[in-house]
Amino acid sequence: MIKTAIKIFLLAVATSFSFLLFSPPPKSFYYSLYISTALSDNVSVSQHLQTLTRRPHVAGSEANAEAAAYVLSVLTSCNIKSHIASYAVSLTYPVSRSLSLTLLPTFHGYGKSGTAKGPVVYVNYGRVEDYVTLEEMGVNVSGSVVLARYGEIYRGDIVHNAFEAGAIGALIYTDRKDFGGGSGDARWFPDDKWMPPSGVQVGSVYDGVGDPTTPGWASTEGCERISNEEVEKTGDVPLIPSLPIPSQDGHIIMRSIEGQVANQDWQGDKDAPIYRTGPGPGVVNLSYKVRRTYHCNNPKCNWCHYREEEPDRFVILGNHRDAWTFGAVDPNSGTAALLEVTQRLEKMQKRGWKPRRTILLCNWDAEEYGLIGSTEWVEENREMLASRVVTYLNVDSAVHGAGFHASATPQLDELLKQATLQVQDPDNSSQTIYESWVGSSNSPVIGRLGGGGSDYAAFVQHIGIPAVDMSFGKGHPVYHSMYDDFVWMEKFGDLLFQRHVAVASVWGLVALRLADEEFLPFNYLSYACELQKSAKDLEDEVSGKGISLNPLFKSIEELTKAATKINNEKQAINKAKGWASIWKKDHSKVRELNDRLMMAERAFTDRDGLFGRTWYKHLIYAPSKHNDYGSRSFPGIQDAVEEANNLKTAESWLTVQHEVWRVSRAVNHVSLVLNGELT
């Protein structure tokens, strides 16, 4: 009996020693390796960017196909299974365009074909409130061509607001006050970072997402399509012609305008002419003709090792490739960072790293026209993605300048903070990115993903997938112009390409933790706190209107309890582990808990979507109705409040109350998912 016991004991010791001797390094080893200088390569990043930006490569062009081939070649050279998914989407290109006072062959994607001749009215940034100001001044916009400046809202909303005000055409220019480095002895590119007076910001004026001829379904070959006339009825494309123009032409037109002097906050820099509202007497002739074509390619690759754990759970990294011009900042700084991530992962693979979950790398096309490549792919794969994707990690323009910026769905806030604590600030070697990001505050400012500005939109706002978006710097003066090239990046954006390397480090580190950790690093307590803040803000907006927010506050309270409970469950499972976990792990329990964490975000969506904007299913985050770039919390409630304030009827406020109940039910559904119990 004693001999048997000794044999068993010796066997246990030997087996344990063997396990320790031959077990792979801990995940933390690979995390440190990933962000080390041994794997990062700023020279390679620079070479990627230089190759990608040799030619302007708008979506559907031969140059963009070459850029796609380059991305694919890098991915395949890393021994990753890669492929291209193609979609036949409707894109527009200029056939002819003319405007007295301007010569540059610039255009608006999905701009309306047509001509417009009329007196000019200056409308500041073209916001709804700017038209209210003009109305109060007695300025009639009807029948005019408006002159607006970039800077506050999405250009498509500028054109839409002009149409709603009765204008017959729209010109949008880049004012030196906003993009040209100010006045006096100001310098511009190539001597400084600022947009030259000849610079033109091009872009799309489409207010929707995805191919406008296939709303809600994928643009596959031979699929159903709605007609151009039906597209116009949706209100997502402009109904008046528009053109972007440079500041030098904007000022020439401005000098032709008389009438009342515009308000002080509508004026330009001190060297600009006096800005007046008009109308006229200057009259402009604007004509624009487009052709449509069908084209789109999305190179994608899988990085996966099928093991016994969770190969059917996906962590997706995405960036778009197409650019209006050379695209050194937007978007190919992000593309170069994506390729840097890929090459680091290959080096880690050679050192024994294997992910627990599948990592999927995507390089989207036609983002600039309206998030088209990512949206079509999401629409085609909706059910699979909804059931299997853990998180979508987006980087659009990786580097604009200095300073780290991030936006996320709130359950990922803590993970972002932890990742930035591990990566050195490229502009201050004595600090981590987190320390520079926080600055003098107690906590970093993390934005939210309600705006429609990049490829996270379909993942978050349509399906309800947790997501992150990140960059260094926020906005750059040569945005969407011919000056967004490699020289600008090398001189003013990232001299040594260390910011690119830092973005790749944070991006990949977040992905590694999501792909490798046994428990998904989600914390829904952050979500509950964020909803509480948003509800408090909403309380001020509906004060005295007879609206009860009690259902909303109660649902948030339940979410706090559910988030606390699932956090405690994770701790209990970890606490119960020990040497026994070497022999047997309860994989089903871990899997079930992770599924609850993954699926909870989906419960914030509603199958009916937002009223009048049914593609947007997420009831917590969606774009502002009058600014596609603007992020709103509780967008359905906010839309209803805006409508009620305009209509001033009891029935309209009942609609607000209904929207409050809808959001409250969604928050309760999230709590049920986290609790993992049927009612």
Predicted feature residues:
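Alpha-helical metal-binding/catalytic segments enriched in His/Glu/Asp
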Residues: L317-L371, E376, W507
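Soluble metallo-hydrolase cores and metallopeptidase-like ectodomains found primarily
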Residues: L101-T133, D207-A328, Q343, M348-R351
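C-terminal amphipathic alpha-helical interaction region
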Residues: D586, V590-T679
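Structural recognition of the beta-strand scaffold that forms the well-ordered cores
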Residues: H48-T51, I84, V120-V123, V145-R149, ...
